[in-house]
Amino acid sequence: MARKTKQEAQETRQHILDVALRLFSQQGVSSTSLGEIAKAAGVTRGAIYWHFKDKSDLFSEIWELSESNIGELELEYQAKFPGDPLSVLREILIHVLESTVTEERRRLLMEIIFHKCEFVGEMAVVQQAQRNLCLESYDRIEQTLKHCIEAKMLPADLMTRRAAIIMRGYISGLMENWLFAPQSFDLKKEARDYVAILLEMYLLCPTLRNPATNE
C-alpha cells in the first residue's frame, strides 16, 4: 500500500510539472502563479507546496529533468559506439537539435528558457543556477573533446575550452533562432548537417589551434 501511495505521489508530482510546463509556455513564467498551476492540474495549492518550495523550485525541477535525460542518452550512445567518443558526441548533438522539434516537452522548455522567462524577483535564484549549469556544461564538453583527442579523432592542439564555448553558443543559437521563427529553416531535416559543420570546424579551423610554443 505504501508503495502505491509513493507511486501516486510521484505521478501527481509529474502531472504538476507537465501542467506547469504548458502554462509557462503559454503565459510566460512571471505571469503564471502557483494558484493557476494548481487549478489547471486539478490539485490544491497545498499539494503544490508539498512537492515544491516555490515557483523557482518547480521550474528548476523541470530543467533538471531535461538535463538528466541527456545524461541517460550519453550512456546509451557510449554503449552503441564503444571507443568512439566523437560519434557519441555527434549523435548527442543531433538528438538535442532534432528533439527540440519532435519532443513537445523539450520544445516547450527551450521556448520558456529562451523567450518566456524573466530571471528577476523569485526567479533570480534560477538565473544563478543556470549560470552554474552553463559553466559545468563547458567543463563537460571540454572533457568530451579531450577524450576525442586521446582517441586521435580531433587534432591534438585543439583549443578545447574555446571549442566548448563555441559548441554551446552554436547549438543554443540554432535552437533559439528556430524556436523564434520555425518557418525560417528545417531544423530537424538539417540537424545532422549543422553538427557536421561544427565538427569539421574543429578539424580544420586554424584559429582553434593552440599556437606553437618555442622552448
Swiss-Prot record:
Domain HTH tetR-type: 10-70
Source superkingdom: Bacteria
GO terms under biological process: negative regulation of DNA-templated transcription; regulation of DNA-templated transcription; response to xenobiotic stimulus
Binding region for DNA: 33-52
Pfam families attached to this UniProt entry: TetR_C_2, TetR_N
Alphabetized UniProt keyword annotations: DNA-binding, Repressor, Transcription, Transcription regulation
Disulfide bonds: none
Stretches assigned to coiled coil: none
Gene3D superfamilies documented for this protein: Tetracycline Repressor, domain 2
Molecular function, one GO term: sequence-specific DNA binding
Function: Potential regulator protein for the acrAB genes.
Xref: NCBIfam families: PRK10668.1
Record's protein name: HTH-type transcriptional regulator AcrR
Organism: Escherichia coli (strain K12)
